Amino acid sequence: NVMFDVGDKVNKELKAFGANITVTSKNASILKDIYGVSDADTPKEYLNESDLGKIKTIFWTNNIVALSPHLEGKITLDNGYVIPLEGTWFDHEIELPTGDIFSTGETYMKSWWQIDGAWPKDNEQSYALVGTALANKLQIHKGDSLTFKDKDNQEQSLYVAGILSSGGEEDNKVITQLSTAQDILGLQGKIDNITVSAITTPENELARRASKNPKSLSMKEYEVWYCTAYVSSIAYQIEEVVQ
């Protein structure tokens, strides 16, 4: 029930690249990529936060370096501006089904992010990073409070822990703890996508065939592919545990 955006990236540069697997709702991805239908046109589908720990139970668990969940929405500030909101993990400890503790989040995934201020802590609520482009546009500074209305039209606020320079789309967002965003948006336990950083073997013809249709492989080919750390086989195994 999920779909993947996978890339064959050089493993020693994983920290520079960040994620090389992105897990999204299959139907949402197909509608957007094939038919050009936006989220506003169709009922939105979500993944379940409760499935995140299962990713570290696949055959290639030791190759999963880090992962981050993401939930996106919008909030309207008290000055009338509508701005993008994203919830994620920053430095989060997750207890795996095995009983082990796995530390992960954006501090592990986005080593190139520059923060003027401090990273929000996952065990605190209502702290946020504000992207530098958005901060410049709205004259937001670290230490400020952003006041807005939530889904129930109740006034809430986010404390600006730092200003983020990412060099990407995050420079135009407010990014807060996943649990905070879920509460604001009324989407407890839900996420839009998962980004995964995995150590992989370069793709070859077998891996490319398998990524299109694993059922096209012979039994021997399937075993070789499944038991090799191709990005496509790791993604396939994630698909087996994430619904």
Question: At which residue positions do the language-model features occur?
Answer:
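Hydrophobic, regular-secondary-structure patches
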Residues: 2-84, 236-242
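Soluble non-cytosolic domains of exported or imported proteins
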Residues: 45-46, 129, 228-229
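Hydrophobic secondary-structure segments that place a key small or acidic residue at a functional site
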Residues: 69-73, 79-91, 99-180, 187-190, ...
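Mobile, glycine-rich extracellular loop/lid and propeptide segments
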Residues: 94
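Acidic/polar short surface loop at catalytic or gating sites that assists cofactor/ion binding
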Residues: 37-45, 98-103, 213-224
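Mechanotransmission and gating elements of multispan inner-membrane complexes involved in transport
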Residues: 151-155, 163-243
